[in-house]
């Protein structure tokens, strides 16, 4: 699923009676994600939410048709960089968005932002480097800095009297950030830590044996997508679900739950967006997504939806004239749109200042596996790296 996906732009043009020639006057957005391989479900969730955002906008921003160009990074940093180059140099997009993986985003950042005319609106990955020393005037995030979500979980565990914790995550940029995040706020004893091979390792039996021997009050993990599915299954198979409570970030969600099923019931996670947040924009987004796709959206999708709405807010404010990049950046920084998370504001490093919530894995009234909000862990949370950013 690579190259131009003309469906969105073409449908928008036809719906409003616009000739194909007007494609030159479109707002053109490149979207880099993983659309093949074992993690393709995440990319599909993001794509669905982008398409829904375009539908909610009536196919236009500031009177111009929206054109989305999807590219598959194949779960590889070098491929992600190549696809980003194509979007900027060949497709001449106004914006590039997407990026699930921190290593893919880090490989692609300069390729997109150093051109000067292209804005990168990251919809998921939030590596610490980009929040700090590598912050960039042409980069905006609609997600979070990697450390923040586990920091929220650490704060929550302190309130619940969890006295000892075992940490596990993959050995790459995001995994290191996630475990650093929970270490930053958790005040109990960390009695073990394992970084597993990424992305090849899907067998966690050796590490789980170490967890069983350590007998912590809980285990904290970060294993997104297919890795989270395997971890939860093996945690239960090892019998640890009866003795070691599981606390997680990005490991149990709308994408993984159809495969994890009841094995994940009762587990707790942290996130900046949950599908039951009560604001009107979120209610519409979740209801329309479920109606269209027969499943719940995930935070990957919610952040992608917000990325399109953020871009639309700036385009509308500038009446479709995206030529003045200083004005464009100023409008993006206002974050003047109805976010599905209920609103946020940008810090100086262009990462959101926002709330983080604790969610429990449950069954809904129809028996579908989902998550529900049980607590607000952090209000107006800032990341830990913004002071290292040269932007003020």
Residue ranges and their predicted role:
Residues 7-17:
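Bacterial N-terminal signal peptides
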Residues 18-23:
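Sec/Tat signal peptide C-region and signal peptidase I cleavage site
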Residues 27, 333-392:
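Solvent-exposed, acidic/polar segments of extracytosolic/periplasmic ligand-binding ectodomains
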Residues 30-49, 71-78, 100, 168-176, ...:
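Extracytoplasmic "Venus flytrap"
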Residues 41-48, 56, 60-130, 142, ...:
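Beta-alpha junction/loop-to-helix N-cap segments that form part of ligand/metal-binding clefts
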Residues 82, 128-131, 136-238, 275-284:
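Extracellular/periplasmic Venus flytrap/periplasmic-binding protein
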Residues 87-100, 119-123, 164-169, 215-225, ...:
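Periplasmic-binding protein-like
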Residues 234-305, 316-322, 365, 371-392:
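Extracellular/periplasmic periplasmic-binding protein-like sensory domains
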């Amino acid at each position: 699923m690579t190259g131009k996906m003309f469906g969105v732009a073409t449908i928008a043009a036809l719906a409003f009676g616009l000739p194909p020639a007007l494609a030159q006057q479109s707002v053109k957005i490149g979207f880099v994600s993983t659309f093949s391989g074992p993690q393709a479900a995440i990319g599909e969730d993001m794509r669905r939410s982008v398409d829904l955002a375009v539908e909610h906008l009536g196919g236009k921003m500031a009177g111009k048709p929206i054109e989305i160009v999807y590219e598959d990074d194949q779960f590889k940093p070098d491929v992600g960089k190549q696809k980003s180059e194509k979007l900027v140099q060949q497709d001449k997009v106004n914006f590039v968005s997407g990026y699930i993986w921190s290593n893919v985003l880090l490989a692609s950042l300069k390729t997109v932002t150093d051109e000067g005319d292209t804005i990168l609106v990251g919809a998921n990955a939030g590596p610490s480097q980009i929040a700090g020393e590598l912050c960039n005037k042409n980069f905006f995030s609609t997600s979070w800095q990697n450390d923040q979500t586990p920091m929220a979980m650490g704060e929550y565990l302190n309130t619940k009297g969890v006295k000892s914790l075992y940490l596990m995550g993959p050995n790459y940029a995001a995994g290191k950030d996630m475990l650093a995040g929970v270490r930053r706020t958790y005040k109990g004893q960390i009695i073990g830590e394992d970084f597993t091979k990424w992305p090849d390792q899907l067998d966690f039996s050796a590490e789980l044996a170490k967890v069983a021997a350590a007998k912590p009050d809980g285990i904290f993990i970060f294993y997104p997508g297919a890795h989270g599915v395997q971890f939860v299954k093996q945690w239960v198979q090892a019998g640890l679900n009866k003795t070691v409570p599981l606390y997680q970030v990005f490991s149990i969600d709308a994408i993984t739950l159809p495969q994890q099923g009841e094995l994940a019931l009762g587990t707790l996670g942290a996130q900046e967006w949950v599908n039951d947040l009560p604001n009107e924009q979120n209610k519409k987004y979740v209801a329309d997504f479920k109606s269209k796709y027969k499943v719940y959206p995930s935070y990957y999708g919610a952040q992608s939806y917000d990325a399109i709405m953020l871009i639309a807010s700036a385009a509308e404010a500038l009446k479709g004239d995206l030529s003045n990049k200083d004005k464009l950046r100023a409008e993006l920084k206002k974050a003047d749109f109805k976010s599905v998370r209920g609103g946020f504001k940008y810090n100086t490093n262009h990462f959101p200042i926002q709330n983080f919530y604790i969610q429990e894995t449950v069954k809904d009234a129809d028996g579908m596996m989902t998550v529900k909000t049980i607590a607000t862990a952090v209000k107006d949370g800032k990341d830990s790296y913004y002071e290292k950013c040269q932007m003020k």
